[in-house]
Amino acid sequence: MSSELLQEVPKSIEHVKHIILILSGKGGVGKSSVTTQVALTLVNKGFNVGVLDIDLTGPSLPRMFGVENKQVHQSTQGWVPVSVYNNNNNQGTDSKRGNLSLMSLGFLLGDRGNSVVWRGPKKTAMIKQFLKDVVWGSTETPLDYLLIDTPPGTSDEHIAIAEELRWANPIDGAIIVTTPQQVATADVRKEINFCKKVNFQILGIVENMSGFICPHCSECTNIFSSGGGKALSEQLNLTYLGNVPIDPQFVELVELQNEQENKKLIELYDDCELKPILNGIVDKILDKNLPSRI
């Protein structure tokens, strides 16, 4: 990497090895759920993971991770992301796990019901601040993966993050989340075109809500159509990372950790039917052996 380019890299991400965006062509496909589970899976594999939520008008990740009531703190280097899971405080059976931290506008709103009614320039400024002023990792403890959860479609937030990340190359690329229905896969094509225009590598497609896991017998039934994501991957010569069914148990685990402070989602997730499925998806990404940024 040239010295000129190094000068442009935000100091906040100079200790980040890998950057992955999670995108979706339309809303309601469960993108934030996939982001949450990819983060949990990487942490379970021993990686230190940070999650940046740039869905400014619908920041749901603080609740997904059970840290809605936490606050962002300021340090001499910048904003410190909220710690979701710190393995330094959980030795023993958890010693192989990594650490997990989160930054989201949800921590700054004060009330969960507060709405964000911002025009493009203010959104762009907020995303720049998130990327440049949040301290991700350190020389002693670098961040292995920074996952960036984006809003659906291609909006001001996407343009802003693409502009800011142009100095962060090489970033790993993007995971695109869709559902099996044609109305969702049609919008995925727009997201793919966006990635090509901004030179984001597409790591693969995840077909979410592909089937329904019965809470009584654990049998998976295709209540919707299935195979749309896989067919699109084959048609466009992209990696098909896998399909994730709807599992009511995962929703229950998210709510359980919010109701009981001593429960952490990463520990509850060990018994979730979706865990081996996400393991397979993450392994396909790891098998690409993408180069580290540092």
Swiss-Prot record:
Q: Which InterPro entries match?
A: Mrp/NBP35_ATP-bd (IPR019591), NUBP2/Cfd1_eukaryotes (IPR028600), P-loop_NTPase (IPR027417), YlxH/NBP35 (IPR033756)
Metal-binding: present as a keyword of the record? yes
Keywords, sorted A to Z: 4Fe-4S, ATP-binding, Cytoplasm, Iron, Iron-sulfur, Metal-binding, Nucleotide-binding
- Relay the cofactor remark from the entry: Binds 4 [4Fe-4S] clusters per heterotetramer. Contains two stable clusters in the N-termini of NBP35 and two labile, bridging clusters between subunits of the NBP35-CFD1 heterotetramer.
Using the UniProt record, give the first listed, main subcellular location.
cytoplasm
- Subcellular location(s) of the protein: Cytoplasm
In terms of Pfam families, this protein maps to: ParA
Q: Where does [4Fe-4S] cluster bind?
A: C214, C217
| Top-rank taxon | Eukaryota
The residues the record assigns to binding ATP are G25, K26, G27, G28, V29, G30, K31, S32
The family database entries (SUPFAM superfamilies) matched by this protein are listed as: P-loop containing nucleoside triphosphate hydrolases
Q: Look up the record and name the cofactor or cofactors this protein needs.
A: [4Fe-4S] cluster
Q: What GO terms are given for molecular function?
A: 4 iron, 4 sulfur cluster binding; ATP binding; ATP hydrolysis activity; ATP-dependent FeS chaperone activity; iron-sulfur cluster binding; metal ion binding
The record's GO CC annotations read: cytosol; cytosolic [4Fe-4S] assembly scaffold complex
Q: Which GO terms describe its biological process?
A: iron-sulfur cluster assembly; tRNA wobble uridine modification
- Give a yes or no for keyword ATP-binding in this entry: yes
Gene3D superfamilies from the xrefs?
Answer: P-loop containing nucleotide triphosphate hydrolases (3.40.50.300)
Instruction: Please give the HAMAP family that the UniProt record associates with this protein.
Output: Mrp_NBP35 (MF_02040), NUBP2 (MF_03039)
- Known role: Component of the cytosolic iron-sulfur (Fe/S) protein assembly (CIA) machinery. Required for maturation of extramitochondrial Fe-S proteins. The NBP35-CFD1 heterotetramer forms a Fe-S scaffold complex, mediating the de novo assembly of an Fe-S cluster and its transfer to target apoproteins. Required for biogenesis and export of both ribosomal subunits, which may reflect a role in assembly of the Fe/S clusters in RLI1, a protein which performs rRNA processing and ribosome export.
Q: Which family does it belong to?
A: Belongs to the Mrp/NBP35 ATP-binding proteins family. NUBP2/CFD1 subfamily.
Quaternary arrangement and interactors, per the entry?
A: Heterotetramer of 2 NBP35 and 2 CFD1 chains.
Instruction: Please state what the protein is called.
Output: Cytosolic Fe-S cluster assembly factor CFD1
Q: Organism source for this protein?
A: Candida albicans (strain SC5314 / ATCC MYA-2876) (Yeast)
Question: What is the gene called?
Answer: CFD1
